[in-house]
């Protein structure tokens, strides 16, 4: 998984893909039901995954919030994830009886169809707060592909010793991925440049470019795209939608 994740850093959209996500992978969403401020109803979560299938998305990272206000325990999230993944695979099997879904990541054997279940993974979106620092010290984290940590800050101000904390993350063997940097309007170009020089990866929210978070964030997103600073794209979905997932 780690080597695969390294490869997709520079992977282009698959030929013939109808998905608006560059590599058919959503690296950031809140679809796992009932664990944060995202989806609450498992049926709505299943409906969203069906929309993902139809949109050409092929892989999804569930990244529920972990922060002092939402102190999710990794082990509890793993239990919820495994239970929901089983529900999804059962739902897929009912919709595609010609396929035999099997395996921990939804691998399948197909006879007369190209239908494939989504590959589902669990990580977390970590607020850089005191809870995170304690869990970083204890090694109690949910990384993407073993070595990448999706992190965020307040949209109003960075944490104290922000870059020092990022360096401590790296010293623990992780590469930080900063979620939606376009939303941190306290940052200036030199701040972004310093983070990139530090080896921090950037994840763009799909809907930032479409104005979902306001004109200032949209403008900042365009600037970061122009500066070629983004490494990943995620939806950051919290509610059911089909808008903008398939390429026009």
Describe the role of every protein-language-model region:
Residues 57, 229-230:
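A structural motif
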Residues 1-95, 99, 106, 110-115:
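An N-terminally biased module of ancient metal coordination in phosphate/nucleic-acid-related enzymes
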Residues 2, 71-99, 103-202:
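Extended substrate/RNA-proximal surfaces in nucleic-acid metabolism proteins
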Residues 201-211:
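His/Asp/Glu-enriched short active-site or ligand-binding loop at hydrolase and phosphoryl-transfer sites
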Residues 53, 170, 225-226:
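Non-catalytic positions within long, well-ordered alpha-helices that form the structural scaffold/packing
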Residues 65, 230-245:
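Short acidic/histidine-rich active-site segments
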Residues 28, 180, 236:
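Conserved, mostly hydrophobic/aromatic
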Residues 188-195, 213-222, 227, 240-248:
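Histidine/acidic-residue-rich catalytic or RNA/ligand-binding cores of hydrolases
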């Amino acid at each position: 998984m780690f080597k695969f994740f390294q490869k997709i850093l520079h992977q282009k959209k698959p030929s013939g893909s109808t998905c608006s996500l560059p590599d058919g992978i959503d690296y950031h969403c809140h679809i796992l039901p009932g664990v944060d401020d995202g989806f609450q109803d498992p049926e709505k979560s299943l409906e969203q995954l069906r929309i993902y299938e139809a949109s050409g998305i092929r892989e999804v990272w569930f990244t529920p919030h972990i922060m002092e206000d939402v102190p999710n325990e990794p082990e509890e999230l793993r239990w919820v994830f495994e239970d929901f993944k089983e529900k999804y695979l059962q739902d897929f099997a009912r919709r595609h009886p010609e396929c035999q879904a099997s395996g921990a990541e939804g691998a399948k054997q197909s006879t007369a169809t190209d239908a494939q279940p989504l590959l589902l993974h669990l990580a977390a979106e970590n607020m850089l707060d005191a809870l995170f620092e304690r869990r970083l010290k204890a090694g109690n984290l949910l990384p993407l592909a073993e070595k990448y940590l999706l992190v965020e800050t307040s949209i109003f101000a960075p944490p104290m010793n922000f870059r020092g904390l990022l360096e401590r993350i790296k010293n623990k063997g992780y590469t930080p991925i900063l979620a939606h940097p376009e939303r941190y309007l306290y940052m200036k170009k030199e701040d972004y440049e310093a983070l990139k020089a530090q080896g921090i990866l950037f994840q763009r929210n799909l809907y930032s470019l479409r104005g979902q978070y306001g004109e200032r964030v949209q403008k900042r997103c365009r600037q970061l795209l122009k500066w070629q600073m983004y490494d990943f794209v995620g939806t950051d979905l919290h509610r059911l939608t089909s808008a903008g997932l398939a390429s026009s």
